[in-house]
Amino acid sequence: MTSTRTLRYAQVACACIWCLFSAGIIFGFAALKPILISEGVYHELCDPKDGDRLLCTAQDLKLNFIFALSATVTNIMALPVGKILDMYGPRVCGIIGSCLLFLASGNFISAKHLVSLWDPYLVGYTLLAVAGPFVFISCFQLANSFPQRSGTVLALLTGSFDSSSALFLLYRLLYQNWFPTLNVSRFFTLYLIVPVFILACQLTIMPHSSYKTVNHIAKIAVEGLDENGRLIEGDTGSGIIPDEQERQSLIAIEREEDSIPSRPQRRKSVLETYVEDKLQKKSGGIFGVLHGKSAYEQIKSPWFYLMLLFALVAMLRINYFIATVRTQEEYLLNDPDLALKLNSIFDMLLPLGGAVSIPFIGLLLDHTDTLSTLTILFTTSTAIGVFGLIPNSFTWNLIGIVLLVVYRPFYYTVVSDYSSKVFGFDTFGTVYGLLSCICGIFNMSQNLLDKWTHTTFNMNPFPINLTLVILTVVFSLTLTFYIRSQILPKPVNERGLSSNYQTI
């Protein structure tokens, strides 16, 4: 028993380590970009008339395109990776991710030799983006390795993902301050340790099959119950039902129902009914509105496509800023030194934002109804956009950056939480995966916005940012008004439970 527990500790620890060094490293692009510029990547695209300028428009657009494509690909991959995980298990996903990291590193290591065949920087960075979901999503099943601490395990994995963008920040600091000869090729030669580590873990200590599917993990995280609506092994239920007398009464009823011969179709257990009724009230009437519907019916609903519209703009704004933070701040502050300072602050705060804010985000979700949480999300998103419109103010732009690094993990967590509560757990992987996939495809428009900023607007980010702020406000208000119109008092039956939920 002890050895099994030790093994599961080791599994979680190893997963956190490799997520920290591979899951979301592409989002550290703002820190990597100065190194690529210094190494002369794509400098051949510059017109000789540009002189000895370190960065020209064509080069900047091509570098930003690398990130735009990678951010698109990593979001698109969420849907197929979830399916592969459920079909073939976490070991296969982890090994695929490891191989992709090998290939990505190989492109950077041999870039000078491959440049005549294809674009090794674009291919390499895109492969890093594809690898991320494979090595990250395959870890979700570990949330049930310690059933009573599934939320803690998920928080550790999510924190590791959010902090992984720090890898390129560390590289930039080493490159600029101590090891100027540590070029991209040498760095990724050292980076080969990461895929080797992942592969070794997958072939030795990591589980071959999932403890649970992605949908089951979502149910455990939200309800604290397993896929059959039962208490998780080893859980007394005190966290779900604080009152001991009430808890023992419900558990007794549960045991009595368990003795009844099984039915062809599973119906909600007594505990499941109790928990979901509490969640329905706690969420302000949002929990369960589309539970039991098919994925197709859910996708046709305004609950899906109105959230999708907001998510499209939100994700685009986040990734567009990551790619263009330096050039935006140079224009707004009209001071390259201050812009560089803000860029450096952003590089440091981005990985810290997720790690620091995750516990507070959890507390907010636990103690605030869903509509209020969405209102906070919408307000924060709008505020960040407004601060990004203020010229000649280091302070306001700094506040906007601080809000953005906290908002990024907040956005992802709230959209995921909304999806599980509204659409349910049976279709969670499909519906949430589709939402992420569509957002990823739409993210390619980031490249068009960047081109317009460089050419049409002469580096002025104001028109693009203002448009995105207006769209944010419109879509936020539309979704808010729709939710308010749909939340109606639910009839309560004689047992005191909402009629939405079917008991045994």
UniProtKB/Swiss-Prot annotation:
Stretches assigned to the Cytoplasmic side: 33-64, 113-119, 172-186, 324-344, 407-421, 484-504
UniProt-listed SUPFAM superfamilies: MFS general substrate transporter
GO MF entries: transmembrane transporter activity
Database matches in InterPro entries: MFS, MFS_trans_sf, SLC43A_AATransporter
Transmembrane segments: 12-32, 65-85, 92-112, 120-140, 151-171, 187-207, 303-323, 345-365, 386-406, 422-442, 463-483
Topological region Vacuolar: 1-11, 86-91, 141-150, 208-302, 366-385, 443-462
Family affiliation: Belongs to the SLC43A transporter (TC 2.A.1.44) family.
Membrane topology according to the record: Multi-pass membrane protein
Species whose genome carries this gene: Saccharomyces cerevisiae (strain ATCC 204508 / S288c) (Baker's yeast)
UniProt cross-references to Pfam families, sorted A to Z: MFS_1 (PF07690)
Compartments where found: Vacuole membrane
Annotated signal sequence range: none
Name of this protein: Protein FMP42
Residue numbers carrying Phosphoserine: S238, S249, S269
Keyword entries, A-Z: Membrane, Phosphoprotein, Transmembrane, Transmembrane helix, Transport, Vacuole
Coiled-coil regions listed in the entry: none
CC terms in the record's Gene Ontology section: fungal-type vacuole; fungal-type vacuole membrane; mitochondrion
